[in-house]
Amino acid sequence: MMIREATVKDAEQLSTLMADVEESNMMLFAPGEREISVDQQRKRMERLETEETSSIFVAEDNYKLVGYLFAIGNSPSRIKHRVYIVVGVRADYRGKGVGVQLFSRLEEWAKKRSIRRLELTVIEHNVPAVSLYKKIGFEVEGVKRDSLKIDGKFVNELYMSKLLSY
């Protein structure tokens, strides 16, 4: 398993992986709902490559992408120290340490950029993800009540964050 920063050459595989992960019904987009072409993904990746406090990390196994982590930074000086995280792992690789490895690589990268705060949201009933985030040091900061509607039911999201020390 290799964890690395994504390049625009990964755009097609990354788009496919994101669609696969969304089949879990635990992401913001419902299965099949995200409409992003490979070209749009490429442009998005090119834009993120130019931002000092943004990056995309991928987990690769035998030349196949099996996980991703978007670190989306900010440019205003008052919030430049934080990044918002979006993470996904292919179903058959969950529970095998891929998420831990992605976050470990993220933290190395973040410390080099003086990023202090990592933040994310997660569906409250996504117990495996919440457990992973707590295991690696994230804390629940609050609840976004009824923030998503999945299969006709309102569900809560948790705000979680981790403060890095360096």
Predicted region positions:
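A short beta-loop-alpha structural element at the N-terminal edge
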Residues: 2-16
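Acetyl-CoA-dependent GNAT
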Residues: 8, 34-92, 103, 109, ...
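Conserved beta-strand segments that form the floor/walls of ligand-binding pockets within enzyme
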Residues: 58, 70, 84-88, 117-121, ...
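Glycine-rich acetyl-CoA-binding "A-motif" of GNAT/NAT acetyltransferases
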Residues: 64-67, 128, 154
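Conserved GNAT acetyl-CoA-binding A-motif
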Residues: 103, 110-121
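Terminal substrate-recognition subdomain of acyl/acetyltransferases
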Residues: 155-166
